Structure formats: C-alpha cells, structure tokens
C-alpha cells in the first residue's frame, strides 16, 4: 500500500497528485483541519511526502515545535518534507498581515541533531536537512527539504 502525499495548507492550489489539508472547506481540500490543532486526523507514518507552500509563516510561534513534531509523527521513515516560505523580516514576509512566524536559512538547524548547538535548546523530533538546502528560490523566497530521522535517546 502506498503512502500519502500531503499538501498542508493547500488552499485552492493543491499540488497535483496530493491529498489537500486546509482549515477551510473549499474546492481541492480533502481533509478539513486546522494545522494548529493537534493531533492531525492522520495515522502515524502515513505520509511519504509532505509539502507546504507558504504556510509555516502563518503558524503561531508558540505552536512551531509542536507543528514540526506533528509532521514528524505522520511522516514515514525516509519521507521528505518540502517547505517554501518568505524569509523572516523580508518584504514578502511583512506584506501579508497574517504572517506571524519568521524563518531564515538557519532556523531549521534547530530541528536537526547535526547542529547540536541549536538542536539541544528545544529537542524536537529529529529531522535531517537534505544536502544543498535551504535554497533561495526568488529574491526573498526560500525552500527547505528535510527527511525524517529516527528518534534518539535525547528526544522527548
């Protein structure tokens, strides 16, 4: 049985071949659920690929760790998380009044145990930043890809 490809916060522009999850009941949305309400209505390790285009900057900062931990829970081992986002503090970030959570190229080191100086602060579920990421896609738009890594003894 194949695993799900999930588009979180898909809105009306769901990626082709993906299951769309959004908090609004609109065309293209398959699962209506708020990304800040945990747990998501999905089984553990049910997704092989999760994409989020311009969604993480809308997650309230106090939900950030739990949000990434929940994506980790539903991600299958070796699955890929692809996120596109405006750089925190940039024009693209500040132009939308609903943007509340800024990310930059080093933010994701807090989720990867290979960067222990940052990872030990919050000890989230361990992700692995894929080689060559994050990358700049436009003037102030970035993309990061991470894979699910096994839980270690220091992860809570």
Regions of interest found by a model, annotated:
Residues 61-156:
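S-adenosyl-L-methionine-dependent methyltransferase catalytic module, highlighting the catalytic core
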């Amino acid at each position: 049985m194949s695993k799900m490809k999930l588009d979180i916060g898909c809105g009306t522009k769901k990626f082709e071949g993906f299951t769309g999850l959004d908090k609004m009941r609109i065309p293209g949305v398959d699962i209506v659920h708020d990304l800040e309400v945990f747990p998501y209505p999905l089984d553990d390790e049910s997704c092989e690929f999760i994409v989020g285009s311009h969604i993480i900057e809308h997650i309230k900062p106090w939900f950030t760790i739990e949000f990434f931990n929940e994506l980790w829970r539903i991600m299958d081992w070796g699955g890929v998380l692809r996120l596109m986002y405006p750089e925190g503090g940039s024009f693209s970030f500040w132009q939308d009044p609903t943007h509340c959570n800024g990310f930059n190229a080093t933010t994701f080191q807090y989720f990867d145990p290979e960067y222990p100086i940052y990872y030990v602060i919050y000890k989230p579920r361990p992700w692995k930043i894929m080689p060559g990421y994050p990358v700049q896609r436009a003037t102030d738009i970035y993309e990061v890809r991470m894979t699910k890594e096994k839980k270690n003894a220091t992860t809570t």
